[in-house]
Structure formats: structure tokens, C-alpha cells
Regions:
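Cytosolic regulatory domains of K+ homeostasis systems
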Residues: 1-152
Length: 152
């Protein structure tokens, strides 16, 4: 019952688990080392789908024929030059699945992404996906100033 529940509640996590059990110990050891080094011993799992309802800022950006990369989700809102504590675990585009995708992978509408991260990174990802000001900063490195436009 718990396997079925997990597959329904966390479908990407379930796919990830089914794929990694086919990998060898060396691959698994490298992944565990990367998780420990870049996050900690208890990373959070975050599933993100690029859609209008869950990631409206990214969705609208991609809909306007702009290009975005997985690295967008790793940007620190404290300092755009830094990456948060995140490890991409899986990228699913329709029926194609990439395990441990690179930051340089382009993201598209409909993509489903599984990330391991800490709480701070999770918060930044949610802000980037849903808040126009934070998204603008993540894309440009500049603060979006529209409230007092033209007033000095």
C-alpha cells in the first residue's frame, strides 16, 4: 500500500527510485557523496512541473518564446552569482527521462523536475516560480522596479 501511495503522491520520486535501483554501487556512491557535499544528510525532495498553475512566471516566460535552463531553479535570491544547495535528480519531458540532469539542460513547458535541496533553496525555487519580482531578479540579476516608475 505504501508503494502505491508514494507513486500517487510523489510520482517523480517513484520514477527516480525505480530507475536508480538499476544503477551500480559506484553511481549510487557518487550521488550520495554529491548530496552530502552540496546539501546535507537529509535533503528535501521537491517536484516541480513547468505549468501555468504551478510555475506561472517560468510558464509565461517560456510561452513568450524565451529560453530558460534548469540552472534558473538553482539561483540564490540572496546573490544571483551563487547557486543554492540543490541537486537535480530527474528531468522528465513527455516520455523521456534524464537522471541527474545537468544545469545546462533547457527547460520547457510541461517538463517535470525532481530536485533534492534544503529549505532555503526550496523557498527560493517557489519564489522564482511564482513571484514576478523574484523571477525578474533570477533572470536579469536586477531588481524589478515598477511601483514608482519614473519617480526619482
Amino acid at each position: 500500500l505504501s508503494k502505491v501511495t508514494n507513486a500517487l503522491v510523489n510520482p517523480l520520486s517513484d520514477k527516480f527510485l525505480k530507475m536508480i535501483i538499476k544503477k551500480d554501487n559506484e553511481w549510487a556512491s557518487k550521488l550520495v557523496s554529491k548530496l552530502l557535499q552540496e546539501i546535507d544528510a537529509k535533503p528535501l525532495l521537491l517536484e516541480v512541473e513547468i505549468s501555468e498553475s504551478t510555475t506561472p512566471q517560468i510558464f509565461n516566460y517560456l510561452k513568450s518564446e524565451e529560453i530558460a535552463y534548469l540552472s534558473l531553479l538553482g539561483i540564490s535570491l540572496h546573490n544571483k552569482e551563487h547557486r543554492n544547495n540543490i541537486v537535480p535528480l530527474l528531468l522528465q519531458r513527455e516520455n523521456d527521462i534524464i537522471l541527474t540532469p545537468e544545469w545546462e539542460n533547457e527547460i520547457k513547458i510541461g517538463d517535470k523536475i525532481l530536485l533534492a535541496c534544503d529549505n532555503h533553496a526550496k523557498d527560493d525555487i517557489e519564489y522564482i516560480c511564482q513571484n514576478a519580482y523574484e523571477f525578474y531578479y533570477a533572470i536579469t540579476g536586477k531588481e524589478k522596479r515598477t511601483i514608482f516608475k519614473g519617480i526619482k
